[in-house]
Amino acid sequence: MASIKPLGDRVVVEPKNESEEKIGSIIVPDTAKEKPQEGKVIAAGQGRYEDGKLVPLEVKVGDTVLYGKYSGTEIKQGGKDLLIIRESDILGVVTN
């Protein structure tokens, strides 16, 4: 399986899995569920250039991040749903 190496200030995020939701005995279909806004960074680019200097990303592989509801580009890789987003679309890093 090929891996994805994001360019520039982009990161690849694996959205947090939503468990199957039931209301009473009714199963809520995937199309009616809200998209998760939390995920794990699985790949990161080298950073962005400002004034000719490389500025490294603030997030790193393994970080759990929060991002905007409509951020990024959805892709499928190896049967997984992934999201490629810019670092500027990341709202914060979840810490324990």
Swiss-Prot record:
Q: List GO terms (cellular component aspect).
A: cytoplasm
Q: Name one GO biological process term.
A: chaperone cofactor-dependent protein refolding
Gene3D superfamilies given for it? GroES chaperonin
Molecular function terms, GO-annotated: ATP binding; metal ion binding; protein folding chaperone; protein-folding chaperone binding; unfolded protein binding
Question: SUPFAM superfamilies given for it?
Answer: GroES-like (SSF50129)
User: What UniProt keywords apply to this chain's record, in alphabetical order?
Assistant: Chaperone, Cytoplasm
Record PROSITE patterns:
CHAPERONINS_CPN10
User: Major location, coarse class?
Assistant: cytoplasm
Q: Does the keyword Endoplasmic reticulum apply?
A: no
- Coiled coil as a keyword? no
InterPro entries, sorted: Chaperonin_GroES (IPR020818), Chaperonin_GroES_sf (IPR037124), Chaprnonin_Cpn10_CS (IPR018369), GroES-like_sf (IPR011032)
Subcellular location, record wording: Cytoplasm
What function does the entry list?
A: Together with the chaperonin GroEL, plays an essential role in assisting protein folding. The GroEL-GroES system forms a nano-cage that allows encapsulation of the non-native substrate proteins and provides a physical environment optimized to promote and accelerate protein folding. GroES binds to the apical surface of the GroEL ring, thereby capping the opening of the GroEL channel.
State the oligomer form and interacting partners.
Answer: Heptamer of 7 subunits arranged in a ring. Interacts with the chaperonin GroEL.
Query: Which PANTHER family does the protein's record reference?
Result: 10 KDA HEAT SHOCK PROTEIN, CO-CHAPERONIN GROES
Q: Which family does it belong to?
A: Belongs to the GroES chaperonin family.
Under what name is this protein listed?
A: Co-chaperonin GroES
Per the UniProt record, the source organism is Leptospira biflexa serovar Patoc (strain Patoc 1 / ATCC 23582 / Paris)
